[in-house]
Each structure stands twice: as C-alpha cells, then as structure tokens.
Regions:
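Non-catalytic, low-complexity flexible loops and terminal extensions
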Residues: 1-63, 249, 253-257
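Secondary-structure boundary elements
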Residues: 8-16, 81-91
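Acyl-thioester-dependent acyl-group transfer interface
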Residues: 59-61, 84-257
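Residues at or immediately preceding the N-termini of alpha-helices
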Residues: 68-69, 126
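Domain-scale recognition of functional cores that engage charged ligands
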Residues: 69-78
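Short, hydrophobic/aromatic alpha-helical segments in well-folded domains
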Residues: 78-79, 246
Length: 257
C-alpha cells in the first residue's frame, strides 16, 4: 500500500491515505481465538549444519523468467529435499500470510502478517502442500498466536538481545532449529501502480530479514513476466558452496506454468 501511495503522489493523483493503527496481534484476534503450542526445536535446515567461524548473514538473488504456479509449495518441496540430502530429520517451514484479506477494504501500512506452518514429509507433492495451505487458510490458522507473541513487546531489549545471541549459539551447535526456514511470497508487483513519468518498473524484490538462529529466509516477488527469489541465511550455513548449490537446485527444480 505505502509504495503504491508514493507513486500516486509522483503521478499527481489523489492520495488514499490511511488512519489505521491496527497491529498484527489485533488483526489475528479479530478472526481467530485459538492459540497454538510451539513444538520442540528439532528441525533441520536446507543446507546442513553450521560450519566455520564467520558470523553474519548473506543474501543472494535468483531471477527467473516466466510465471510459476504454486510457487510456495514448489519451493517448500525443493528445500525439504535439500535438507534430507544432508541428513535425516524433521522439516517444517513457516509461511508468511498477509492477513489483510480478513478485512476487505482495509488500508494500512502495517506489517499485518502471521505464519502458517508446513510439516514436510518425504513423498509429499506440490499438490499435497498446496492443499495443506488452502485448508489451513480455510481453518483460519493464519490468526493463531503463540503465547509469546503477546508478551514479547514487554521484554526489555537488552534481555531480548541476550536471549537471541544464546539461541544462535545453541541452534548452530545442535543443528536443530525452531523451523527449517521461513518462506514469504508478497505476490506479483504491478508495473502500472509502481511507475510514473520518470520511472518504469520492470521487476522488484524484497531482501528477507534472516537471523542467524534461522536456517533460511526466502522472499519471492516479481511481475507477470518473471519471478525474483531472494535467499538470506547465516554465513555458517551458506559457505562451502552450499548457498550456490541450493540456488542451482531451485533454478533446476522450479516448474513454470
């Protein structure tokens, strides 16, 4: 919404504006009263275990021409297969869902997203995963919250920072994580809405905000003509050619419409 509003201003068009103060917690509570209990942190990552001593996060972009149906499901299946190529273990992906569709007509600049979760099993097909996501959305699982979601805003930043650093060390030592990764698909960008007299959009992408306590974060965007896949991950999980290998696996495995 906010990017489209900027281009309305650049084109000299009337602005729509927004006075919404809705948060993702408020949005979730508005349509789902059930909560969820977190499973044990026992999930493996798509590129094996942490190696080396280099800290920090690295990101790369994969540009692919054409249109791709069921893109989230395709990516989830490929990432799961990659994880099992390194070791046996449980694989679960969080999929970011924009909850704005729960309130049609809402105009907000907030990040009104929550996660649904895909528990991957060997033999699951893209169609299986697609049906699972559709059923979870029908059940309104995108509004289910963990108890910690309600409390984290009250945790002092210093305490939160220390907890995150401790978790990074633990997860990278054990090779077992809260999730195998996060997959986000904001959808196709509209060149018409994101262009003006002096700028014509050809493609666009989002750099996913990965943390070192998470094996991988993938964000996908693009237009009707192409898809952009952005991958971010810890340097300890990307080194040794593993990130490049995963990108090659995605490039070869994704099937266009």
């Amino acid at each position: 919404f906010w990017a489209e509003e900027i281009f309305r201003a650049l084109r000299g068009e009337p602005l729509l504006g927004s006075c919404s103060r809705l948060t993702e917690l408020d949005m979730a509570r508005s349509f789902q009263k059930k909560g969820r209990t977190p499973p044990a942190h026992d999930f493996i990552g798509p590129t094996g275990r942490a190696q080396g001593t280099e800290s920090g996060v690295i990101w790369r972009r994969l540009h692919m021409e054409g249109r791709y149906r069921n893109l989230v499901a395709q990516v989830a299946v490929i990432l799961a297969q990659s994880a099992w190529s390194y070791e046996a273990g449980k694989v679960r992906f969080g999929v970011s869902v924009d909850m704005r569709h729960r309130q049609p007509g809402l105009r907000s600049t907030g990040n009104l997203t929550n996660l649904i979760y895909l528990n991957m099993l060997p033999g699951l097909t893209v169609d299986d995963v697609t049906r699972d996501m559709a059923q979870q959305l029908a059940d309104k699982n995108d509004g289910m919250l963990y108890w910690g979601d309600r409390l984290i805003r009250y945790v002092p930043l210093r305490m939160l920072h220390r907890a995150i650093q401790d978790e990074i060390k633990e997860k990278q030592h054990t090779g077992r994580y809260r999730n195998s990764g996060i997959i986000s698909n904001p959808g196709r960008l509209s060149p018409e809405r994101l262009s003006c007299d002096t700028f014509a959009l050809q493609t666009g992408f989002f750099i996913p905000p990965c943390q070192e306590s998470l094996p991988i974060f993938i964000a996908m965007a693009g237009t009707d003509q192409c898809v952009e896949i952005l991958i971010s991950m810890s340097r300890k999980l990307a080194n040794g050619g593993r990130m490049a290998g995963l990108m090659e696996r995605l490039q070869k495995g994704l099937q266009p419409s």
